[in-house]
Amino acid sequence: MAIHPTAVVEPGAQVDPSAEIGALAVVGPHVRVGPRTVVGPHAVLAGRTTLGEGNRIFPHAVVGEVPQDLKYRGEPTELVVGDRNTFREGVTISTGTVQGGGVTRIGSGCLFMANSHVGHDCVIGDGAIIANSVALAGHVELEDHVHFSGLAAAHQFCRIGRLAFVSGLTGVTMDVPPFCTVAGPRAELAGLNAVGMQRAGLSEERIGRVKQAYKIVFRSNLGLAEAIAQVEAELGMHEDVAHFVRFLKGTQRGITR
């Protein structure tokens, strides 16, 4: 275990022998640091935070501090982080709230660029790319492989679907369907994330089916329920389309159009 002599690792913290803790970093008493995780100088790991394997926390990141919620009264809420994530300089990640289930969750293989923020009770899937100064409000849910460009933001309780792309400076206030791109100060649909789907290894056949579903839902004159019914009738047996439809059906805030 490589712990710099100026680091503060409080009694009760569980640090794997293969982890590294840098100069003037602080690890709180309820923190668990997994194998091969590297905590940089001046970083802070607080709260009931669990980090998996191979994560890297850069200087001045604050991971696991209490939620920015006036209802919070010191309850023992958590932050659970998977493996191989990168938290760059100045990133802030809050623990959950009792009202939101008590846990903020981050998957594996994500990149959080400098000064980005993940609010309380967020659920982030695998492979997310969260660019500089992105702000995710409380209770936001990101499915796998979502990309947020710089200075974008998401309102509380919004859901962002798998392989969606949020352009820079975009304000998301409603759910963003899987495979879609949104842009603009008030997010509007800007087409499908074809490049992202190709990079994720989707075949041209699979991408073509998603395009068909997209056109029925967003380029016809049908209402949402009627469009969903048509998609299910014509394409619903295909996995990607079925996921697209389930997401649309599950919306509480409405769908970005």
Swiss-Prot record:
SUPFAM superfamilies: Trimeric LpxA-like enzymes (SSF51161)
Pathway(s) of this molecule: Glycolipid biosynthesis; lipid IV(A) biosynthesis; lipid IV(A) from (3R)-3-hydroxytetradecanoyl-[acyl-carrier-protein] and UDP-N-acetyl-alpha-D-glucosamine: step 1/6
Residues annotated as transmembrane: none
Single GO biological process annotation from the record: lipid A biosynthetic process
InterPro entries in the record: Acetyltransf_C (IPR029098), Acetyltransf_C_sf (IPR037157), Hexapep (IPR001451), Lipid_A_LpxA (IPR010137), Trimer_LpxA-like_sf (IPR011004)
Catalysis performed (reactions): a (3R)-hydroxyacyl-[ACP] + UDP-N-acetyl-alpha-D-glucosamine = a UDP-3-O-[(3R)-3-hydroxyacyl]-N-acetyl-alpha-D-glucosamine + holo-[ACP]
Domain of life: Bacteria
Keyword Transferase: yes
Enzyme class: transferase
UniProt main location, coarse: cytoplasm
EC number(s) stated in the UniProt entry for this protein: 2.3.1.129
Compartment list: Cytoplasm
Keywords of the record: Acyltransferase, Cytoplasm, Lipid A biosynthesis, Lipid biosynthesis, Lipid metabolism, Repeat, Transferase
One GO CC term, this protein: membrane
One Gene Ontology molecular-function label: acyl-[acyl-carrier-protein]-UDP-N-acetylglucosamine O-acyltransferase activity
The protein's assembly and partners: Homotrimer.
Its biological purpose: Involved in the biosynthesis of lipid A, a phosphorylated glycolipid that anchors the lipopolysaccharide to the outer membrane of the cell.
Protein family per UniProt: Belongs to the transferase hexapeptide repeat family. LpxA subfamily.
Name this protein carries in UniProt: Acyl-[acyl-carrier-protein]--UDP-N-acetylglucosamine O-acyltransferase
Gene responsible for this protein: lpxA
